Design a protein with these regions (language model features):
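Conserved eukaryotic protein kinase-like
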Residues: 1-148
Length: 148
């Protein structure tokens, strides 16, 4: 299961950067590094939409952290301290698939082009990840916001 990260650690170890990777309905995502000098890059989602109780959030974290599949990003940690909520995921160095389709509004990365064989590999990977969520995961996961 993902480990708890305290907000103070999140502010000093994760928020000491200015690279905003994106923003969605639940909050902004930033690039940071795992604490302890390991230089492992992570993606930190700072949640602004805080519906539900802390217990609801912890239940969701438990469910998400049980999902383990090569086509699903791993949850490494979380923060639930007072009103602060954050999710710490592994960092995907090639970025989100939407960069290849739309480009990025947060930096100067232009739209990237994919060859058909690579696009096919991505489609198959997305399908395998969704299949795992629907049929292969021991815990039933209702997925509303799948991002390929």
């Amino acid at each position: 299961m993902a480990g708890e990260v305290y907000f103070r650690t999140t502010e000093t170890d994760y928020m000491s950067f200015s690279v905003k990777l994106g923003e969605g309905g639940y909050g902004a995502v930033y690039r940071g590094q795992f604490p302890g000098g390991s230089n492992v890059p992570v993606a930190v989602k700072l949640l602004t939409n805080k519906k539900g109780t802390g217990e609801d959030f912890e239940n969701e974290v438990t469910t998400i952290s049980r999902a383990s599949h090569c086509n699903i990003i791993s949850l490494l940690g979380y923060c639930l301290e007072g009103s602060h909520r954050a999710l710490v995921y592994e960092y995907m160095q090639n970025g989100s698939l939407d960069l290849y389709k739309f480009g990025s509004i947060f930096d100067s990365i232009e739209r990237k082009q994919l060859q058909w064989h690579k696009l096919y590999e991505i489609i198959v990977g997305v399908a395998r990840g969704i299949d795992y969520l629907c049929t292969g995961c021991r815990t039933q996961i209702v997925h509303f916001d799948i991002k390929p």
